[in-house]
Amino acid sequence: MKAYAKANIFLKLTGFDSRKYHLLESRFILLKDLFDELELVDKESDSKKEFEIISNFKCENNIIQKAYLLLSKRYNNELKELFSKKSLKLTKNIPVCAGLGGGSSDCASFLLLMNETLNLKLNLQELINLSIQLGSDIAFFLSGFHSANVSGCGEIIEEFEDDIPNLKWTFPQISCQTKAVYDEFDRGIFDFQKNNNQAQIYKKLSTKELLQNFKNKELNDLFTPCATLYPKMKSYLQEDFFLSGSGSSVFKVDR
């Protein structure tokens, strides 16, 4: 099963919820040519792990493990039987700490794979309700939409009929820590009402129109704090690249 990456075309922070989590307005688009892959494979006879992930990256305490534990509260017997014979193979192609949602997409694909394999018969809303307990971007990947306006803490998804130009990507070898970038944003000067007003304009425009008519700092509230925390990102800010999420992946329209 393919777990596709995503890009944020705009990302505006508009307040906090009751848990002090950031509220956002954003355009998410699915990147169909960049994906991780998940599959069930026969378990090695000497493996003693109840749930084993075989991967080309470090998997301890990752979001798929958390999804397994959450599902096991309701489907413990089914999961134990499956993973007594199978392991989960995860092939990572999406850069990590890059603003592309790789972990969230992997988690969504794991939930979908379990729903299909174990015939759990969970509908989309039930899957989204589970995903909210795990992470903020997962709902978009569950939706299957190619483009959507996303709000709340990432759980409110509205499909958008979009015009998406070809994008040229650059993946700096910089691991941007999401929490650190958000914390740096909080230390700055911001106007949530202004951000929300801008977002209401942006969400009506196509991705092509957004990238043609607005500056990178206007579209993504996290670009300035990202460049402050990670000085090597400043050159991309100055050279009119657009930032996805909290970084470090950047892109331009491929003309």
Curated annotation (Swiss-Prot):
**Single biological process term from Gene Ontology:** terpenoid biosynthetic process
Alphabetized Pfam families for the sequence: GHMP_kinases_N
- Active-site residues? K6, D137
Provide the top EC class: transferase
What Gene Ontology molecular function terms does this protein carry? Answer: 4-(cytidine 5'-diphospho)-2-C-methyl-D-erythritol kinase activity; ATP binding
Q: Which InterPro entries match?
A: GHMP_kinase_C_sf (IPR036554), GHMP_kinase_N_dom (IPR006204), IspE (IPR004424), Ribosomal_Su5_D2-typ_SF (IPR020568), Ribsml_uS5_D2-typ_fold_subgr (IPR014721)
Q: Superkingdom, according to UniProt?
A: Bacteria
Amino acids binding ATP: P95, V96, C97, A98, G99, L100, G101, G102, G103, S104, S105
Could you list this entry's UniProt keywords, alphabetically sorted: ATP-binding, Isoprene biosynthesis, Kinase, Nucleotide-binding, Transferase
- Name the pathway it acts in: Isoprenoid biosynthesis; isopentenyl diphosphate biosynthesis via DXP pathway; isopentenyl diphosphate from 1-deoxy-D-xylulose 5-phosphate: step 3/6
Q: Which reaction does it catalyse?
A: 4-CDP-2-C-methyl-D-erythritol + ATP = 4-CDP-2-C-methyl-D-erythritol 2-phosphate + ADP + H(+)
User: What is the E.C. number?
Assistant: 2.7.1.148
> What does the UniProt function comment say about this protein?
Catalyzes the phosphorylation of the position 2 hydroxy group of 4-diphosphocytidyl-2C-methyl-D-erythritol.
The family note in this entry says:
Belongs to the GHMP kinase family. IspE subfamily.
The entry's protein name is 4-diphosphocytidyl-2-C-methyl-D-erythritol kinase
Species: Campylobacter jejuni subsp. jejuni serotype O:6 (strain 81116 / NCTC 11828)
